[in-house]
């Protein structure tokens, strides 16, 4: 009833949600594990930064995502204050820190990913029952250590209580011109996808050599 333009924008937002379902599901798992809120005030990232306490619009989602929603009409550029460290703008892969401005496009909800994060993303699909053939891991450069979690199970039933789940812990480390990505896995569940792509974001130099074990 709002016209094709707005229908398409709503469709894009819904499809983005489905692409980020691995992050959403893992955020729910972390909440059941230790009570971590899935959506948090920015002060959770650094309680000692007084500027973060003043931010009312933006919020943290899951382990490593910061969302800066557009809540006013006709906004073309939006100011954002980021917690300490580098954060990558998802749509461009550009790193930023502190106070900055981003260009606002109607079909791109502004959000950032923390440096060192491993962000699991599904391909575009229309419903949760659709077969998922591959998973993409967006790996964000950081000079230092970081960890990320990906939790998966059948999505229904109680078999996860007897070990039928998959928990992957990703550990990244950038140091002296090298970068390592390690994975530890727990649980007996095997996800349906057979292919995993790795997409490197923000690396300061061209990758000259890659070693897989």
For each predicted feature, which ranges?
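Catalytic core of carbohydrate-active enzymes
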Residues: 1-203
